[in-house]
Amino acid sequence: MEQGQDTPWTQSTEHTNIQKRGSGQQTQRLEHPNSTRLMDHYLRIMSPVGMHKQIVYWKQWLSLKNPTQGSLKTRVLKRWKLFNKQEWIN
């Protein structure tokens, strides 16, 4: 990939403005996102219930030890299906 060429990923994260609602502080920019900063971003914009679910998801994702892309995809899909079933039951 050529240097300076934005991918959809970098466009959606590096240039995302985070507005702190009601605090009067200036907006922050995610210049070099990593797992922790992305998690922080999601926690700021989510409801308390959604926030708890996202924390659980991120802790599980970050706890994986050297996952291959295939095993990660399988694990995430299983969690997503289970999560959706629970949402419909509740």
Swiss-Prot record:
A Gene Ontology biological process term: symbiont-mediated suppression of host cytoplasmic pattern recognition receptor signaling pathway via inhibition of MAVS activity
Chief localization: host cell
Record's subcellular location: Host mitochondrion inner membrane; Host nucleus; Host cytoplasm, Host cytosol
Keyword field contains Membrane: yes
Low pathogenicity, annotated site positions: N66
Keyword annotations: Apoptosis, Host cytoplasm, Host membrane, Host mitochondrion, Host mitochondrion inner membrane, Host nucleus, Host-virus interaction, Inhibition of host innate immune response by virus, Inhibition of host MAVS by virus, Inhibition of host RLR pathway by virus, Membrane, Modulation of host cell apoptosis by virus, Viral immunoevasion
Region ranges (Disordered): 1-34
Pfam families for the chain: PB1-F2
Function, in words: Plays an important role in promoting lung pathology in both primary viral infection and secondary bacterial infection. Promotes alteration of mitochondrial morphology, dissipation of mitochondrial membrane potential, and cell death. Alternatively, inhibits the production of interferon in the infected cell at the level of host mitochondrial antiviral signaling MAVS. Its level of expression differs greatly depending on which cell type is infected, in a manner that is independent of the levels of expression of other viral proteins. Monocytic cells are more affected than epithelial cells.
Extra facts: Is not encoded in all strains, and seems to be dispensable for replication.
Subunit structure and binding partners: Oligomer. Interacts with human SLC25A6/ANT3 and VDAC1. Interacts with host MAVS.
Full protein name: Protein PB1-F2
Organism: Influenza A virus (strain A/Chicken/Hong Kong/YU562/2001 H5N1 genotype B)
Lineage, opening ranks: Viruses, Riboviria, Orthornavirae, Negarnaviricota, Polyploviricotina
